Amino acid sequence: MTKMTNRAKQAEATKNKIYECGVKLIRKHGFDQVTVEQISKEAGVSVGTYYYYYQSKFDLFSEIFKRADEYFLNHVASNLSAKTFHEQVVEFFDKYADFNISDGIEMVKKLYTSDNKMFITKGRAMQKILQTIVEAGQSNYEITGYLSSQDITNMLFVTARGVIYEWCLYDGNLDLKEEMKKTITIMVKGLS
């Protein structure tokens, strides 16, 4: 493993600072109301420095989803303790609920708009992890093989996003983890 140079560490710190400031402003004002200039000012960097790390404001937005995928790859995929398909899917979406709760209701409300196409971007790590669980469930005859693993994965995410949207509608005054568990449990029972 190569050791990072001081310059590389500084560059990573600068990129993270821009990211954190951008997320803070997006959380507060919404994606469309925040400018690159505001993010740069908040981060204490020039606009040119911003564009060195992110080609556009949308690149920073994409980074939010990239980091969510990295979290699921590094902390969720290999740490699911459940054994059956049903239990694994419920546990996966419990972690998904936890992740949204940790982002905070205001940030999640800003992300959950019909203009945000990141949720339907194909091939994301989060989707691949769930699809692997679905494929194992199909291989073990725990769930239907009538639908493709991709279709089932998509349906489960559509359902989970609906639960999170409901949480947003109630301004976080809903037990997201309990609602997610109840809804996903019913959904996976229907796949048997």
Locate the predicted segments by residue.
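N-terminal intrinsically disordered/low-complexity leader segments
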Residues: M1-A13
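C-terminal peripheral helix-coil segments that are non-catalytic and often amphipathic
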Residues: M1-T2, A82, D98, T132-N140, ...
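Amphipathic, non-transmembrane alpha-helical scaffold segments
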Residues: A11, K15, F61, F65, ...
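Helix-turn-helix
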Residues: A13, K17, L25-D59, E63
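Conserved hydrophobic residue
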Residues: D32, I143-T144
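Hydrophobic alpha-helical connector segments
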Residues: E63, N74-S102, T153-L156, K177
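Amphipathic alpha-helical packing segments from all-alpha helical-bundle domains
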Residues: E70-L73, D115-E142, Q150-N154, V158
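Amphipathic alpha-helical segments used for helix-helix packing
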Residues: D94-K117
